[in-house]
UniProtKB/Swiss-Prot annotation:
GO terms for biological process: maltodextrin transmembrane transport; maltose transport. This is Galactooligosaccharides transport system permease protein GanQ. Coiled coil: none annotated. It comes from Bacillus subtilis (strain 168). It is a multi-pass membrane protein. Belongs to the binding-protein-dependent transport system permease family. Induction: Repressed by the transcriptional regulator GanR and induced by galactobiose. Also repressed by glucose. Residues 76-268 form the ABC transmembrane type-1 domain. Pfam families: BPD_transp_1. Keywords: Cell membrane, Membrane, Sugar transport, Transmembrane, Transmembrane helix, Transport. The lineage of its organism: Bacteria, Bacillati, Bacillota, Bacilli, Bacillales. Involved in galactan degradation. Part of the ABC transporter complex GanPQS involved in the uptake of galactooligosaccharides. Responsible for the translocation of the substrate across the membrane. It is found in: Cell membrane. SUPFAM superfamilies: MetI-like.
Length: 283
């Protein structure tokens, strides 16, 4: 009996490791292929390999050569601007909104939370025509600020629900003790609730940064001129030309997108992991 239990446990453990190894291959292999393609000479992917026989930095040099048809530096700056402002704006809006839902009781509170969940079920592309018409009416075609506001609005519902669940796990006794000492709701938020909510705030910040950085659908709808493009839109147009497509240069540009994401993740790694775990178990 004991031997059978050990065998079953060994089989489950072996299956778990095989599953993890399979998932690791699925995740890592495309990254290695992209990295290898960026160092391969030529523009085609047919003759590329993960380990280039004759590696070259020509594609990276081409990105920063300042060609009119390849404004990579400008696209990079645009993406960083949009992502950073979206991250800051969404973090501010989400924390304030979640605090209100977590600590105050008002009419329509439960309906608003339900509405937040329902909004997540509506596909983004279903509102593209309305958003484009709105941008035209406001005269904000090619406007990064309109794009930032749209991203912030899209991030608020789900992230607010996550943050609210985390704030609910913070004991109300802390608020009551602070109120006895004469602290206002604003002071309680900034000096007690917000510092204790840093783990989940890191998750919200990461979502706010990576979402706009990798978005193509909405940004391609609002941004129409090359100088206003973000990286996904600019790199797509780089390979959209059938005759002049440069897939290896695209690979080099795509690889560089991961640098700011990696930097932000490393900075927030400790809080990010604990906050993600807490968001799934608390509230």
């Amino acid at each position: 009996m004991l031997a059978d239990m050990k065998v079953r446990r060994y089989i489950r453990l072996l299956f778990s490791y095989l599953l993890l190894a399979f998932m690791a291959v699925i995740i890592v292999y495309p990254l290695l292929w992209t990295a290898g393609a960026s160092f391969n000479p030529g523009n085609s992917l047919i003759s590329t390999s993960i380990i280039p026989k004759h590696p070259t930095f020509d594609h990276y040099k081409e990105l920063f050569a300042g060609k009119e048809s390849l404004q990579y530096v400008q696209w990079y700056v645009n993406s960083m601007k949009i992502s950073l402002f979206t991250m800051a704006g969404s973090l501010l809006c989400v924390t304030f909104t979640a605090y209100a839902f977590s600590r105050f009781r008002f009419k329509g509170r439960k309906y608003a939370l339900t509405l937040f969940l329902l909004l997540q079920m509506i596909p983004q592309f279903s509102a593209l025509i309305a958003l484009f018409v709105l941008a035209q009416i406001l005269g904000m075609i090619n406007s990064h600020w309109l794009l930032i506001l749209l991203y912030i609005g899209g991030l608020i519902p789900m992230n607010t629900y996550l943050m609210k669940g985390y704030m609910d796990s913070i004991p109300m006794d802390l608020d009551e003790s602070a109120k006895i000492d004469g602290a206002s709701s604003t002071r309680i938020f900034f000096q007690i609730i917000l510092p204790l909510s840093k783990p989940m705030a890191a998750v919200v910040a990461m979502n706010g940064f990576t979402g706009p950085l990798g978005d193509f659908v909405l940004s391609s709808t609002i941004l129409r001129t090359p100088e206003s493009y973000t990286l996904p839109v600019g790199l797509f147009n780089l390979v959209n030309d059938v005759m002049g497509a440069s897939y290896t240069t695209f690979a080099a540009g795509a690889l560089l997108i991961s640098i700011p994401v990696a930097v932000i993740f490393i900075m927030l790694q400790k809080n990010f992991v604990s906050g993600l775990t807490a968001g799934g178990t608390k509230g």
